Amino acid sequence: MELKTLDDKDLKKDERLYIKGIRLINSVKIDYKTQKHVSFLVQGDNELHNVMYFDEKPQDKKWQCDCKWYTLQDKLCSHIIAVNLAIKNGKLKIDQ
């Protein structure tokens, strides 16, 4: 599975969420990995969130989070942004 991170343009679309994502980078951990998806844990301000990457889903649904923002808005959240930034910045290694 080749994990595809989001474009910088998409990550920076909402400046407030992007800044929060930067702040959360160090709280990102890999939970588990299968052949078709990867589960990440992100410690948010108040609770632990699960971010999932689904290889087999369409591009706009590959990244999902269990937080209220993502669930209600169906838009990128700071937790998904944090995972993407951690991968892009080399703070999180995904074995291919």
List each language-model region with its residue ranges.
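Long, low-complexity, compositionally biased intrinsically disordered regions
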Residues: M1-Q96
